[in-house]
Structure formats: structure tokens, C-alpha cells
Regions:
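N-terminal metal-binding scaffold of metallo-dependent hydrolase/deaminase domains
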Residues: 1-48
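Conserved N-terminal beta-strand of ABC nucleotide-binding domains
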Residues: 2, 23-26, 59, 63, ...
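Divalent metal-coordination and catalytic microenvironments
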Residues: 8, 26, 31, 64, ...
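Hydrophobic faces of well-ordered beta-strands that scaffold small-molecule active sites
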Residues: 70-74, 131-132, 152-155, 184-188, ...
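Alpha-helical scaffold segments that flank or form the walls of functional sites
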Residues: 84-149, 169-178
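Metal-coordinating catalytic core of metallo-dependent amide/deamination hydrolases
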Residues: 140-255
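Active-site-adjacent C-terminal substructures of enzyme catalytic domains
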Residues: 194, 244-319
Length: 320
């Protein structure tokens, strides 16, 4: 489909990390933006067309509207749409072990396919055009995204109870070869669901593939406390000691950080993905965003899954 937006205010990137707003037109040909400008320099576009012109399927007067680049949802579990608003009154550990994990054990690949498509439909209503997903049946999730024309990067949810490191490597190659719309990187669910031996395997695979690693990190005070009891250090320090960050990556939530955790993230150029609405629902706490900014650490925002957030609205999460 060929679409022309005109009379629009358009937010476009400029030098550095800044943006500017221009007034003009935005043209979409099939699935590609082919022009953004004031509409006075379109000859260069027409010159590339075989017929010297473009037949529009739709022309939209966008006066008094602002066109924005698509949002990226930096952390989510899309297919958890089936658990939306489920068990709203429990802290994270009870919520996971008593309510979520038993329900997830019943899911099939076909369930994941249709639940993923349902989630993608919701993403599009708030301008989300790509996501960083973590869930089961990654090849099925990739197929759902491809069928919808949606861009999905996935990270492994590897832990002590599902799959193997060999399967993670196999899926890495399969998903990364499926389409330009899909990708996959090594990772694991969290320190508290993954033994030290398995964590070492993830670090070794990251080294072998030269790939970054992502995981749920320091989401609750209990998680950090128990990790210290097991290993005498925070989850971030443990992963650093295991060589997990040689090729970058990051953590989801990052609510309970100590001074050395900030230093490791800064030194390794890691990304802290905040999930404010999810952390509030599960009474986990509030991430120290001001400290991340002060330290110059990469920051991103995710919705988390719809079960721990109750929606997949990126704008609403940024507002929180």
C-alpha cells in the first residue's frame, strides 16, 4: 500500500541524540518510508520511479497531528496477554511461583502464536513498531511477528527448568536467519532461576557467538538479598565475575543497585531497561533513574508483560 501524509508536523532525528519538528510530507511505499520533507524537493523521489510517478492508495491530511518514529518496547513478554490483570495483589515471587508458572506450563506453540498476534495488535495502537521479547517457543514468536510485518528481537528465557544451552545456540542461528524482521540473542530468565553452572554456560555461549546477554536483574530487594546469601555479591557483580558482559547487553528492571553495580554498567556500556508500571503493580520498588542518568548509563523503557503491567502502552509507561 502506498500512503501519503501531508500537512503534517513530523518529528525527525537531527545531530546527536536530539530531534526537530518539521512541517511537510511523509511518503510510504509498501513497507518503506521513501520521503520525509517539506514537499518541495520530491523530484529526486519521482526520478527513481519507473513511471515517474506514484499512485497513492491513501492520502491523509495530517494537519494538527504530529507524526512520530515508531516506539521500541525494550522489555516484554508479549504472549502473556492471557494473564492480563491476573493476581493483582501479590508480590513478585508469590505471583510468579504460585500463579504464573503453573499457568504457563499449559501453553502450546499454537497458543503462543495467537497470543503474540493479539499482543502485536495492542502494540500498534500505541505506536510500538518493534519489541524486545522474552518467552517460550521463540521460533513461533518470530513467525507471528513476520506474519504481522512487525519487528521483534528476542532474548532467551533460559533457566534451570526449561530448554538447554545447546537449544539456545540452535535457536540463535534459526531465528536470526528467518527474516530481517527477527533476531535473537543469548540470555537467561534471572539469577534466582538459573544455577551457577548454567550461568557459566550462557557466558561461554556469549563468548563463542560474540553476542550480548540480557536478563532480569535486581528487580526486588529479596532477589538481591538472596543472591548475596548464595554468592556473597549482587547479581550484577556475579555476572561480571562470570564474564557475562564481555560483549555488552543489559538488565531488565535494575531497581536495587549498589555503587559497584552502577560502575559495572557504566564500564561495560550496558543498558538498564526500566519497567515502572510493572514494578509498581508488583510492589517491587522504583528504579534509580536519576542515578543512571547521572552516571551516563544507557536507559530504555519497557512495558514488561501484560500480566505484570496490565497493558502494552508505551506512552502510558513513559508517563509513569
Amino acid at each position: 500500500m502506498n500512503i501519503r501524509f501531508y500537512n503534517a508536523r513530523i518529528l525527525v532525528p537531527s545531530e546527536g541524540h536530539s530531534f526537530q519538528v518539521i512541517t511537510g510530507e511523509l511518503w510510504v511505499k509498501k513497507n518503506e518510508i521513501i520521503y520525509i520533507g517539506d514537499g518541495l524537493d520530491t523530484e529526486r523521489v519521482f526520478e527513481k520511479e519507473p513511471a515517474g510517478m506514484i499512485l497513492w492508495d491513501r492520502e491523509i491530511d495530517a494537519e494538527k497531528n504530529l507524526l512520530l518514529p515508531g516506539f521500541k518496547n525494550a522489555h516484554t513478554h508479549t504472549a502473556m496477554t492471557f494473564l492480563r490483570s491476573y493476581a493483582d495483589d501479590l508480590p513478585l515471587q508469590d505471583w510468579l511461583t504460585k500463579q504464573v508458572f503453573p499457568k504457563e506450563a499449559l501453553l502450546t506453540a499454537d497458543d503462543i502464536y495467537w497470543l503474540s498476534i493479539l499482543g502485536i495488535m495492542e502494540y500498534l495502537t500505541s505506536g510500538i513498531t518493534s519489541n524486545f521479547d522474552m518467552y517460550f517457543f521463540p521460533e513461533t514468536i518470530a513467525k507471528a511477528s513476520i506474519d504481522c510485518g512487525f519487528r521483534t528481537m528476542q532474548v532467551s528465557s533460559f533457566n534451570d527448568f526449561t530448554s538447554s544451552i545447546e537449544e539456545m545456540e540452535e535457536i540463535y542461528h534459526k531465528v536470526n536467519e528467518m527474516s530481517d524482521l527477527t533476531g535473537y540473542v543469548p540470555g537467561f530468565h534471572a539469577e534466582y532461576t538459573t544455577s551457577k553452572e548454567h550461568l557459566k554456560q550462557v557466558a561461554a555461549l556469549s563468548e563463542k557467538l560474540h553476542a550480548p546477554v540480557y536478563f532480569h536483574n535486581s528487580e526486588t530487594a529479596l532477589e538481591v538479598e538472596q543472591c548475596k546469601e548464595r554468592y556473597g555479591m549482587t547479581p550484577t557483580r556475579l555476572m561480571e565475575e562470570l564474564g557475562m558482559f564481555q560483549y555488552g547487553g543489559g538488565g531488565y528492571h535494575c531497581v536495587y543497585f549498589e555503587d559497584e553495580d552502577f560502575e559495572i554498567f557504566r564500564k561495560r556500556n550496558l543498558t538498564a531497561v526500566t519497567n515502572p508500571a510493572s514494578n509498581l503493580k508488583l510492589a517491587s520498588g522504583i528504579a534509580p533513574i536519576d542515578r543512571f542518568i547521572k552516571e551516563g548509563i544507557n536507559l530504555a523503557i519497557g512495558t514488561d508483560g501484560p500480566a505484570s503491567n496490565n497493558c502494552l502502552d508505551k506512552i502510558g509507561r513513559a508517563h509513569v
